[in-house]
């Protein structure tokens, strides 16, 4: 699954400069403690995290003076990019429902839903595909996870998940929304491992469809180029080999003679787990300050592996990779 995801992600990224290239926006919504964060974390581990941007916003009461989606437009992905967006405009929609309670203006609610649908269709028409995933669990599982030591850090909808009345209202509205919009993928969060795989497969299917569509449109726009690539003998200007031999530049000794600090596998895993835990705590205590880690060096020198080990204990909403 990871290999397939990276293959499609690489294809998407390599097509970013093309006329028919597309971006992918993944909207993540649903119940608290239903496995949303775990699923996105697994996705970033199975793919190249450099080309996935993860955003999260808290639900706000929608303004009457601008479209409900207006404040979220800066999180949209560019061509060749993948963006995962927790909360998003649906968190604002749910916030409106709970703020209004029994005095909800059904006409305004319907208008906001129609505005969202029009905006999403406009994104698709302008080469940004959308995958919408709704996570849910039953009440028994929710109650158990709410008493766990590490609950979901993002209270996206500003509601009390310990109150049965709030949970019932949330489920009632989510059922209504699912009935109005058939574009949602329902992710069952009862089994975390299974929901991670289900979510990843939904993303994989979307990437494959996007890449196939881009390739088909490229072939339609450039039939001559397609014919030449299939028949290289027809190329009017074949690439000529360089007559000069390749001469590698001498490297500084410190770059090729790195001092080795080998560890036993058991010691390595123990130290790694301990230091990852300390690092995660320090990062979460930074307050409003930003922390920047800069990696530089030779290809295949371990930069990517080091980055993966640093982000492993973190929530995808806590970091961005450039």
Predicted regions and their residues:
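Glycine-rich phosphate-binding loop of ATP-dependent small-molecule kinases
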Residues: 1-322
């Amino acid at each position: 699954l990871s290999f397939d995801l990276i293959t499609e992600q690489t294809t998407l990224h390599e097509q970013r400069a093309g006329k028919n290239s597309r971006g992918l926006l993944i909207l993540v919504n649903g119940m608290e403690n239903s496995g949303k964060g775990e699923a996105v974390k697994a996705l970033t581990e199975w793919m190249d995290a450099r080309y996935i941007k993860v955003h999260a916003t808290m639900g706000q009461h929608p303004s009457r003076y601008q479209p409900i989606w207006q404040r979220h437009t800066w999180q949209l992905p560019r061509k060749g990019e993948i963006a995962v967006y927790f909360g998003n405009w649906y968190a604002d929609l749910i916030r409106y429902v709970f703020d209004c309670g029994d005095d909800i203006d059904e006409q305004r609610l319907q208008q906001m839903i129609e505005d969202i649908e029009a905006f999403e269709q406009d994104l698709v028409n302008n080469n940004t595909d959308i995958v919408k995933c709704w996570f849910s669990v039953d009440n028994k599982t929710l109650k158990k996870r709410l008493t766990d030591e590490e609950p979901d850090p993002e209270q996206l909808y500003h509601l009390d998940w310990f109150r049965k009345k709030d949970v019932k209202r949330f489920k009632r509205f989510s059922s209504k929304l699912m009935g109005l919009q058939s574009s949602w993928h329902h992710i069952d969060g009862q089994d975390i491992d299974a929901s991670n795989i289900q979510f990843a497969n939904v993303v994989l299917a979307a990437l494959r469809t996007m890449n196939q569509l881009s390739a088909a449109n490229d072939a339609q726009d450039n039939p001559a180029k397609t014919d030449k690539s299939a028949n290289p003998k027809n190329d009017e200007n074949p690439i000529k080999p360089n007559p000069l031999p390749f001469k590698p530049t001498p490297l500084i000794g410190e770059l090729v003679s790195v001092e080795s600090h080998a560890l036993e596998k058991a010691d390595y895993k123990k130290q790694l787990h301990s230091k990852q835990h300390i690092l995660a705590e320090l990062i979460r205590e930074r307050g409003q300050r930003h922390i920047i880690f800069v990696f530089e060096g030779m290809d295949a020198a371990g930069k990517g592996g080091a980055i993966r080990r640093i982000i492993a204990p973190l929530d995808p909403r806590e970091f961005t990779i450039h």
